[in-house]
Amino acid sequence: MTGSFSVKLKSKKGQFIVNDLNEHTTLGELKTKIVQATDIEATQLHVLVGYPPKPLDLSQQQEQRALKAVGINSGETLIVEEKAAPAPAAPVPGGTTVEDDEALARRLQAEEEAQLLQETAGGPVAQAADYQLPVAPTESGPNGDFNGILLKKVVPADNSCLFTSIRFVLNGKVDNEGSEMMRHIIAQEVAADPQSYNDAVLGKSNAEYCAWIQKADSWGGAIEVSILSNYYGIEIDVVDIQNAIINRFGEDKNFGLRVFLLFDGIHYDPLYMETSPSAAPATIFPVEELGVYQQAEQLANEAQSSRQYTNVDKFTLRCMQCDVRLVGQVQAQEHAKQTGHKNFGEI
């Protein structure tokens, strides 16, 4: 008996599951099903498959090949895009470039988590989204403030707190499922631009950094926030409570929406707005709404005044493996290099 399998289609029109496939289904047959599901003409189909997504050869010479032979397996996600039809008087383009494919993959992959909110800020709401992400209410209180309180959502104090926090502000979930994907996204971006991400910027070679950031025990910081801000098309404002300032990543890109993270010197937590006990927490806010930003500034000042931060240059640590006392991050790192000890506790 021939085993059946399915694939997922992700397109601007929406997301679809194609179930009635088997190991003998041809690429030509799948093309027909994609056309039926997405209403895109066969001659204008542009399909990406795999991770990182790569363009699928849809030429007539390939149409009789079985799906598995062209690299499509059960459970695969296919990113489907419509190529612009060439103008009658213009020469036919030679095809999309690698840069086009990478930009397309980033755009559609980010769409599942952030596109609906981007469109809410500047146009009609898309019908294709699987779910609506939390967004701040439009009602304003006195002085333009939102009718809600900006609060900290505590996330696990592990090596992925930055990625967990970003996942929460994008989709309202506290889990570690998106950390590996975000690390991979960052590594791809860095590897693709060795001139910008050189040894001086990274503190290590480009290749070493790309391997390092994909390890589960590597911390994220400014470089990673900047890349993810650009990838998701949203401003990420990091509220630095040690210095009582807000670092706006993506400010120069004029994004329409922003999220807030709280940083105490060693740990990130996401910020959200609670508008009522029954409403879902709001985590994404229009940039032009200054009331929320002012709340974040106030929170930073209050946290600094009460010293709710860790000064990584002056805090005192104890090595939990040999009981030696250390002052600051530099001493701790040097001790770790010399001894291999990695378990420290703050005193």
Swiss-Prot record:
It catalyses: Thiol-dependent hydrolysis of ester, thioester, amide, peptide and isopeptide bonds formed by the C-terminal Gly of ubiquitin (a 76-residue protein attached to proteins as an intracellular targeting signal). Residues 290-295 are annotated as: S2 site. Residues 150-274 form the OTU domain. InterPro entries: OTU1_Ubl, OTU_dom, Papain-like_cys_pep_sf, Ubiquitin-like_domsf. Keywords: Hydrolase, Metal-binding, Protease, Thiol protease, Ubl conjugation pathway, Zinc, Zinc-finger. Substrate binds at I266. GO terms for biological process: endoplasmic reticulum unfolded protein response; ERAD pathway; positive regulation of double-strand break repair. Residues 8-89 are annotated as: UBX-like. Residues 5-87 form the Ubiquitin-like domain. Residues 213-223 are annotated as: Variable-loop. Residues 155-161 are annotated as: Cys-loop. Pfam families: OTU, OTU1_UBXL, zf-C2H2_OTU1_C. Disruption phenotype: When irradiated with X-rays, adults display increased wing and eye abnormalities. Third instar larvae exposed to X-rays do not display any changes in pupation or eclosion. RNAi-mediated knockdown in third instar larvae results in reduced survival in response to UV radiation. The active site is at D158, C161, H267, H341. One of its GO terms (molecular function) is cysteine-type deubiquitinase activity. Its EC number is 3.4.19.12. Hydrolase that can remove conjugated ubiquitin from proteins and may therefore play an important regulatory role at the level of protein turnover by preventing degradation. Involved in the regulation of DNA damage repair. This is Ubiquitin thioesterase Otu1. It comes from Drosophila melanogaster. The lineage of its organism: Eukaryota, Metazoa, Ecdysozoa, Arthropoda, Hexapoda.
